[in-house]
Amino acid sequence: MGAQLRVYKRRIRSVTATKKITKAMEMIAASRVVKAQRKVAASTPYARELTLPRLGTGSNTKHPLTTEADSPSRAAVLLLTSDRGLAGAFNSNSIKAAEQLTERLEREGRQVDTYIVGRRGLAHYNFRERKVVESFAGFTDEPTYADAKKVAAPLIEAIEKDTAEGGVDELHIVYTEFVSMMTQTAVDSRLLPLSLDEVAEESGAKDEILPLYDFEPSAEDVLDALLPRYVESRIYNALLQSAASKHAATRRAMKSATDNAGELINTLSRLANAARQAEITQEISEIVGGASALADANAGSDN
């Protein structure tokens, strides 16, 4: 019985130490998600203001990045995951959304080139021996605009190339949208070719009268410079959304782990108390039994 009590005490110490770790991770994630939320809010106006003049230009300009191919045959999919785990279903939901998008594009006759941000997504694809054109890692917790530019560069290069030279006709992105501390949703969005109606709706300019611009030297030259910045800003915003979602998911997972550890400690404490009481009861029974046997022996010797 004493050995069982020692086992319970050892498990209580182990779970208590784990609870301290998960509580600390919960607090760190809570701090990071607040910072990430602020960055998301700060990056949105930039993407919106960058888009509005593009709307006024692109609506009357034929440009490779705003014109859909007659028969698109190849698409690039950028999947955003995290470098670390301990975030519940955050990564699995994003990967599932990317796989569903890939299946849909392939059914429509497109060859899909996959680009991945985050070690978790890359590990998933490598384990299943799926081809990844290019991957990026090491910055998913706190992405910067420089990271977004690094991710966007090969994608912009691919969309500008002809498909016969290894280019793509479309660019899609899959990331986790931060809705609230309790809700994060995996979504997919087509970045290129730009859909004027979709971008207008996203930017809130659907019913807005757009200003007229006079561009020098030409609208096409402006689009050449403007659209890469647009792609970079959209990817940056998606990286920030994913970072905020990951921290929120980690906070929620660690809170659940902390609560479960507390419940397990209570259960083990009850079992330890029961084992201690049983041990005490057994000792008392042995003492009483020994005293009774001694009394019987003394009575027999007197007779």
Curated annotation (Swiss-Prot):
It is a peripheral membrane protein. Keywords: ATP synthesis, Cell membrane, CF(1), Hydrogen ion transport, Ion transport, Membrane, Transport. It is found in: Cell membrane. GO terms for biological process: proton motive force-driven plasma membrane ATP synthesis. GO terms for cellular component: plasma membrane; proton-transporting ATP synthase complex. Disulfide bonds: none annotated. InterPro entries: ATP_synth_F1_ATPase_gsu, ATP_synth_F1_gsu, ATP_synth_F1_gsu_CS. Pfam families: ATP-synt (PF00231). The keyword Ion transport applies. It comes from the Bacteria. GO terms for molecular function: ATP binding; proton-transporting ATP synthase activity, rotational mechanism. The keyword Kinase does not apply. F-type ATPases have 2 components, CF(1) - the catalytic core - and CF(0) - the membrane proton channel. CF(1) has five subunits: alpha(3), beta(3), gamma(1), delta(1), epsilon(1). CF(0) has three main subunits: a, b and c. Produces ATP from ADP in the presence of a proton gradient across the membrane. The gamma chain is believed to be important in regulating ATPase activity and the flow of protons through the CF(0) complex. PANTHER family: ATP SYNTHASE GAMMA CHAIN (PTHR11693), ATP SYNTHASE SUBUNIT GAMMA, MITOCHONDRIAL (PTHR11693:SF22). Belongs to the ATPase gamma chain family. This is ATP synthase gamma chain. It comes from Streptomyces lividans.
